[in-house]
Amino acid sequence: MSTFTPTRNDWQLDEILELFHTAFNDLILQSHLLHRQFFSNNEVQISSLLNIKTGGCPENCKYCSQSAHYKTDLKKESLLDIESIKKAIQTAKKNGADRFCFAAAWRQVRDRDLEYICDIIDLIKSENLESCASLGMVTLEQAKKLKNAGLDFYNHNIDTSRDFYPNVTTTRSYDDRLTSLNNIHEAGINICSGGILGLGESVEDRAKMLLTLANLKEHPLSVPINRLVPIKGTPFENNAKIDNIDFIKTIAVARILMPKSYIRLAAGRMSMSEEMQALCLFAGANSIFYGEKLLTTPNADCNDDRNLLSKLGAKTKEPVFFNS
C-alpha cells in the first residue's frame, strides 16, 4: 500500500472503547490491514527469555510466583553464573531466536550488579542477537550505562490500568513504573512494555492500559500481551480465564493504536489452541517467546511453534542491530 496511517500519541478513551465494541470481524480486518502497512507479511519476531535470578522478589504483585509475599512451590535461586547464561544464549540462537531477553526477580536495578549485567549484554551481542533486560525499576543514570553497554530493549510492563493497578500491586506505584519507562526512553533504549489480561480487570481497564502505552512520548517498540497463568499460592490463583474473543480483540486494538510496534503473544500461550494463536497473528500479533519456560511458567514447545509457523506459512524475523 502507498498510503500509510500516521502514528498517534493523542488517543482518547472513548475512541479506544469504540474499537473494543466494534464487531469482531470488522475489528480484526481493520487491524490486519493496518498491520500489513508497516510489517512484512507473515513475519514473526522470535524472542527467548531467561530468568537469571529466581524468586525472593520484595514486590507483592498478586499474580507472581516469584513474590516473597506468597507461599508458592517456587524455590528461590541465586544469580545464574555467566557460563550457564552463555549456554542459554547459544541454545536460543540455535532454536531460531533473534532476541535474547533476561530477567531478574528484583525490585530495581542495583549498581553493584551493573558489571554483571553488562557482561550478559556482551555475551548476547557476541552471538549477533538483539538484547533485552527486565530487571525492575531503573534510574536514568543506570539506563544510560546499559545503553552504553549495547542494550537494545528494556522491558518494564505497566500490567493494567492506573485505576485497577492497586488491586494488583501496592509495593510500587503506577508512577514508579512510568518514571522508569521515561528513564529508558531518555537513555535511548527501546521500550518493551505491555500488560496482563485476566487479572479481574474490565474492558475499560484494558482500554486505559493501552491508552497509557499508546500515548507515551514514543510507542513501545515491543508490546507484550500476557494471558494470566494462575499460580497456586498467589491471590489470583482462582481467577477466571479471560474469554478468547476478548483476548484477540485486545491484540487487535493494540495493533491499531500502535501500528509500528511488535505486539507479542507472551505468557499464557500454553492455554491457547493453534487456531486461537493463528487468529491473534491475523489480528496483529507478530512476536512470540520461544522456549520451554517463561520465567517460571510453562511455555509452548519450540517444535510445536515451528510446526505452527510452518502451517501458517510464516517466516521468522532477522535481528536488527540497534547498537552496532
From Swiss-Prot:
Catalytic activity: (4R,5S)-dethiobiotin + (sulfur carrier)-SH + 2 reduced [2Fe-2S]-[ferredoxin] + 2 S-adenosyl-L-methionine = (sulfur carrier)-H + biotin + 2 5'-deoxyadenosine + 2 L-methionine + 2 oxidized [2Fe-2S]-[ferredoxin]
Binding site for [4Fe-4S] cluster: C57, C61, C64
Domain annotation Radical SAM core: ranges: 42-269
Co-factor binding comment: Binds 1 [4Fe-4S] cluster. The cluster is coordinated with 3 cysteines and an exchangeable S-adenosyl-L-methionine.
EC number annotated for this UniProt entry: 2.8.1.6
Gene3D superfamilies reported for this sequence: Aldolase class I
UniProt keywords, alphabetically: 2Fe-2S, 4Fe-4S, Biotin biosynthesis, Iron, Iron-sulfur, Metal-binding, S-adenosyl-L-methionine, Transferase
Cofactor: [4Fe-4S] cluster; [2Fe-2S] cluster
InterPro entries recorded: Aldolase_TIM (IPR013785), BATS_dom (IPR010722), Biotin_synth/BioAB (IPR002684), Biotin_synthase (IPR024177), Elp3/MiaA/NifB-like_rSAM (IPR006638), rSAM (IPR007197)
Residues annotated as binding [2Fe-2S] cluster: C101, C132, C192, R264
Superkingdom as given in the UniProt entry: Bacteria
Recorded metabolic or biological pathway in which this protein acts: Cofactor biosynthesis; biotin biosynthesis; biotin from 7,8-diaminononanoate: step 2/2
Top-level EC class as recorded in UniProt: transferase
Disulfide bonding pattern of the chain: none
A molecular function GO annotation: iron ion binding
Role: Catalyzes the conversion of dethiobiotin (DTB) to biotin by the insertion of a sulfur atom into dethiobiotin via a radical-based mechanism.
Family to which the UniProt record says this protein belongs: Belongs to the radical SAM superfamily. Biotin synthase family.
Subunit note: Homodimer.
This protein's name: Biotin synthase
Organism of derivation: Ehrlichia canis (strain Jake)
